[in-house]
């Protein structure tokens, strides 16, 4: 009598798990494809990194604005720090710059070109991202770094790791650069994963850099090492930095305080 009931309970659990998985699959299937480049879209040869937001409006849902009439300018090589409470719109600003979403009004310009007039593939190649939680593949350390520029040589990969202050810990791994990481690099510390992410960005050599809470999940000692690697990465590049820690934003050329999708204060840290 008990055995059929157990089987029924197991079947019910399996069905529930399958439904949850199916829901995620349908979300992917229902995702709208990105719009194609317009005819005559331009490239970004000789990128300088001059970024402008001109009266930009954006909402994920109609009638619920997230970014409101935002105007900002980053000159080539400048570092712009975006600070503010959670949900203020900081990450949305960088999502608009990468053109993960199209704006509702206003203009975003890079080197004088409207973002919508730039070939999307070239725009993405010009941008480098270091996020709070960077995805790593179940592959070797070498190939995970090479993902930043697939045609890079082994020597270029190792040089990027040296600049990111990652070479030392990599060589201490069981097979060095040939060490295979587990899914999402669970066999590395958070700080080590961030150093690999920085090495990946250095290898990509982007003209514009986006750092989204890149040091928020590490201890202060590890943060100091990562911060030094980030300074090398940011040198000469237009950079947008989202952070709460003072150490990350104190050298920024501009600090923009964001609240409810608007810039409520701007200046330099002093």
Regions picked out by a protein language model, each given a short descriptive name:
Residues 1-28:
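Cytosolic ends of transmembrane helices, especially the final helix of ABC transmembrane type-1 domains
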Residues 31-32, 184:
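Short cytosolic juxtamembrane segments of multi-pass membrane proteins
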Residues 27, 34, 146:
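Conserved E/DxxT/N motif and adjacent residues on the DHp alpha2 helix
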């Amino acid at each position: 009598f008990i055995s059929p009931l157990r089987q029924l309970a197991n079947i019910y659990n399996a069905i529930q798990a399958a439904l949850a998985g199916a829901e995620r699959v349908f979300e992917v299937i229902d995702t709208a494809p990105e719009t194609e480049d317009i005819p005559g879209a331009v490239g970004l040869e000789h990128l300088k990194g001059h970024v402008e937001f001109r009266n930009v409006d954006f909402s994920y849902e109609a009638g619920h604005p997230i970014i409101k009439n935002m105007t900002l300018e980053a000159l080539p090589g400048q570092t712009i720090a975006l600070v503010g409470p959670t949900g203020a719109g900081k990450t949305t600003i960088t999502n608009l710059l990468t053109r993960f979403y199209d704006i509702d009004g206003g203009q975003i310009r890079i080197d004088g070109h409207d973002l919508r007039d730039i070939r999307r593939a070239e725009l993405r190649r010009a941008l480098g991202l270091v996020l709070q939680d960077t995805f790593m593949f179940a592959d070797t350390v070498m190939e995970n770094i090479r993902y930043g520029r697939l045609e890079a040589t082994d020597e270029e990969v190792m040089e990027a790791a040296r600049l990111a202050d990652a070479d030392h810990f990599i060589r201490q791994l069981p097979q060095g650069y040939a060490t295979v990481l587990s899914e999402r690099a669970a066999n590395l510390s958070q700080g080590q994963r961030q150093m690999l992410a920085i090495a990946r960005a250095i290898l990509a050599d982007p003209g514009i850099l986006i750092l989204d809470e890149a040091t928020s999940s590490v201890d202060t000692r590890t943060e100091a090492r990562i911060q030094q690697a980030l300074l090398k990465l940011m040198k000469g590049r237009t950079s947008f930095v989202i952070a709460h820690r003072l150490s990350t934003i104190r050298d920024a050329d501009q600090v923009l305080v964001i609240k409810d999708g608007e810039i409520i204060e701007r200046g330099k840290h002093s």
